[in-house]
Regions:
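Conserved acidic segment of CheY-like receiver
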Residues: 8-28
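Active-site residues of response regulator receiver
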Residues: 15, 61, 65-66
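Acidic, metal-coordinating helix/loop segments flanking the phosphotransfer/catalytic sites
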Residues: 39-62
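Receiver (REC) domain active-site loop signature in two-component systems and cognate sites
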Residues: 69
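A Lys-centered signature of the CheY-like receiver
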Residues: 117-118
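CheY-like receiver
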Residues: 133-148
Length: 148
């Protein structure tokens, strides 16, 4: 019997700011070696990638969206994700420079987290820690379903 490695935790992050993309990738790389951060630079590319995942592909256990992106912004991306069956329950965090109540309310209405930029590596590590446990639970549940 061949024993396979456990699936890697996937975090998907869409942001047009390359510095922010690197900050998030670095924080997850330092904090959790079993997390792979996949990225896109706008909502359209994010939706294209996510909608093309096949049945047996690893679904991200966390999606982080910048609110102010070109082509399709983070809010519209969130709305479209919530319409997709595989992503209705996946945790999403809106990551933005805005601290406006209307943006926070939007995130709450669509069951998403809300984090205001700028943040530093220490804050990002805290955020990574907060969501890694969820990713681990998600992976365990997927393995159980596959074994049934």
């Amino acid at each position: 019997m061949t024993q396979s490695l456990p699936p890697k935790n996937i975090v998907f992050y869409a942001d047009d700011d390359l510095d922010d993309l690197e900050l998030v990738k670095d924080a997850f790389a330092q904090y959790a070696k079993d997390v792979e951060v996949l990225t896109a630079t706008d909502g359209s590319k994010a939706l294209s990638y996510l909608s093309n995942l096949k049945k047996y592909d690893t679904i991200p256990c966390l999606i982080i969206l910048d609110v102010n992106m070109p082509v399709i912004d983070g809010k519209e991306t969130l709305l479209r994700l919530r319409e997709m069956e595989h992503f209705q329950e996946v945790p999403v965090v809106l990551f933005t420079t805005s601290s406006q109540p209307i943006d926070k309310n939007f995130a709450q209405r669509y069951n998403a987290g809300f984090i205001t930029k700028p943040i530093d590596v220490k804050q990002m590590e805290f955020i990574a820690d907060k969501f890694i446990d969820h990713c681990a639970d998600d992976i365990r549940n997927r393995i159980r379903r596959q074994m049934q």
